[in-house]
Amino acid sequence: MMARRTKARKKEKKHVEQGVAHIKSTFNNTIVTITDPQGNTLSWASAGTVGFEGTRKGTPFAAQLAAEKAAKEAMEFGVKTVEVYVKGPGAGREAAIRSLQAAGLEVSLIKDVTPIPHNGCRPPKRRRV
């Protein structure tokens, strides 16, 4: 006897007007994640997923393309306005925010949520080039 295939129901797309854009910008990469207000991921993109490799992932242009891709995917869910939370010291911070606005998302808030230690872990040693 063959097992009967159950009919898979098509997953309905959520409709979210308000979103939250989390931009994590390091020296080596930029990751843009767009979530709903509860924190469930709608779309994400990084400099690597848009085709950059190696040191080019840390550039502002790579961050711009990553933010653009994430914004386009999020707009399919009906996202119109976003709050932006930026984390990290990387080069792609400003470029990613500007790119979100250029893609047609209205930015209602920009907040820096970079974690700052109260003298926690010892930092890596200084580079001598």
Curated annotation (Swiss-Prot):
Gene Ontology biological process: translation
Matches recorded under Pfam families: Ribosomal_S11 (PF00411)
Gene Ontology terms for molecular function: rRNA binding; structural constituent of ribosome
TM ranges: none
Keywords in alphabetical order: Ribonucleoprotein, Ribosomal protein, RNA-binding, rRNA-binding
Gene Ontology CC: ribonucleoprotein complex; ribosome
Highest taxon of the lineage: Bacteria
Subunit structure: Part of the 30S ribosomal subunit. Interacts with proteins S7 and S18. Binds to IF-3.
Protein family according to the UniProt entry: Belongs to the universal ribosomal protein uS11 family.
PANTHER family to which the protein is assigned, alphabetical: 40S RIBOSOMAL PROTEIN S14/30S RIBOSOMAL PROTEIN S11
Function noted in UniProt: Located on the platform of the 30S subunit, it bridges several disparate RNA helices of the 16S rRNA. Forms part of the Shine-Dalgarno cleft in the 70S ribosome.
Protein name: Small ribosomal subunit protein uS11
Gene from which the chain derives: rpsK
